[in-house]
Amino acid sequence: MNILLTTLISLVMTYEMPKLPYANNGLEPVISQATIDYHYGKHLQTYVNNLNSLVPSTEFEGKTVEEIVASAPDGAIFNNAGQVLNHTLYFLQFTPKPNKHEPSGKLAEAINRDFGSFENFKKEFNAASTGLFGSGWAWLSVDKNGKLHITKEANGSNPVRAGLTPLLGFDVWEHAYYLDYQNKRAD
């Protein structure tokens, strides 16, 4: 492949920061503007920049973040792609000042079917989140048969690697909560 075509492909397939659907202070008082500025503006931006510098001229050039996460071996490309995917899903899942605090419709039905109740789901999800040693993510995902699963993923891993579709992610890396909650992960 010639250099011009390679350059054009890399320009087209650059990974970008997601646009937040809320203001940086829109999640207060639960998540402060300082945390959003730091977590979104510094951490996620660094993962995006790293991924854009690592992928060109590799077998992953031209692939989506999901494809990279599903197929890349452990290492720098996987770690940065995983964190871009995880953080993108994380930041886009929030709604400032929601008027409902419980799921409804098909999601509520699936939670009741697979966990017995929303309360049971919350207990299991919180246990996964607080029980993960070190850094990582807790996820609610769905498999190809529609069954819900709670998983704990170390570091930058994602349920996509196991063929699951993530629905809800909770970042338990300290940078996600330390400015607001210090060492109180369970809060």
PLM regions and their residue ranges:
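Feature for soluble, non-membrane regions of globular proteins
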Residues: 9-187
